[in-house]
């Protein structure tokens, strides 16, 4: 298992990829050697694919309509927290045109006392706006949200995330941050090229 491992890419044929600080990617690779030059593994990169990377936004009465609250299809285990980011994989019901991209947002309440709840959890919502443009064609989607802007206190128990699930309606998912190794899932060959999100 390569979770929480340091990797050294030994192939240099990825010069086409322009790395941007803070940009999350899905990396497909083959492990070559263990314990290589101070890294856990040397790997041959097969593919790098950018993941939509966004900041947490503030939900206000003025932004409520723009963020929407349309249902989204997310399967159990497809929301993870790692490296200061919340990573979400889902099945997008594609819009009719690339000009009509849907919006997916991780939002925080406007008031800090609501964000940092008395229960010891940070309270967030996943919001989706399909702009009433659905084709019934599905494609995998992925998005990562930078949680570092939240200034989460060290005594925080975790994160409670509200979302509108296609399967279960309004639900709340709890992520306990104190459990090492929780909420991790091995991601394999996912093609995000058809995703239509902003």
Residue ranges and their predicted role:
Residues 13-28:
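Short nucleic-acid-contacting surface segments enriched for D/E, G, S/T with interspersed K/R
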Residues 20-23, 127-166:
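Short, solvent-exposed, Trp/other aromatic-anchored flexible loops in extracytoplasmic proteins
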Residues 28-30, 89-91, 125-127, 146, ...:
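Residue-level recognition of well-ordered beta-strand positions that form the cores
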Residues 29-41, 135, 152, 164-173:
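Short acidic/polar inter-strand loop motif in beta-rich domains
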Residues 35-91:
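Surface-exposed beta-loop interaction hotspot
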Residues 75-134:
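Short helix-loop boundary/capping segments
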Residues 167-198:
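Short beta-strand elements
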